A protein has these predicted regions:
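Conserved PLP-binding catalytic core of the aspartate aminotransferase-like
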Residues: 1-12, 16-51, 61, 65-69, ...
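PLP-dependent enzyme catalytic core of the Aspartate aminotransferase-like
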Residues: 49-53, 60-100
């Protein structure tokens, strides 16, 4: 449980440092807010090509204009897994104009 908590905090901190809007949570499910359905689908597809499996959620699963990428963290993730995911989010976020 301690490792899961550490992994969640580490991932969220890294993502926020890059400029991503992360919905506050106490769980291991992290919502990276993108607000646009097509963007969330494209972002998730590009992450999969980078070896990162995530789900893009959009209306009607979440309210309109609250599309997001759902990241499920676990205690089995090692720091290098988290770093790879953060780096992939950074690369694609810049390509798609989500972050600078």
């Amino acid at each position: 449980q301690d490792k899961l908590h550490w992994n969640s905090e580490y991932f969220v901190a890294g993502m926020r440092t890059l400029g991503f809007d992360i919905k506050p949570t106490k769980s291991a499910i992290c919502a990276v807010m993108l607000y646009d359905a097509r963007l969330s689908q494209e972002f998730a597809a590009r992450l999969l090509k980078e070896g990162i499996y995530v789900i893009g959620f959009y209306f009607p699963v979440v309210p309109k204009n609250e599309a997001r990428i759902r990241v499920q963290l676990s205690a089995s993730h090692e720091r290098e897994h988290l770093d790879k995911a953060i780096q992939a989010f950074e690369k694609i976020g810049k390509e798609l104009g989500v972050i600078k």
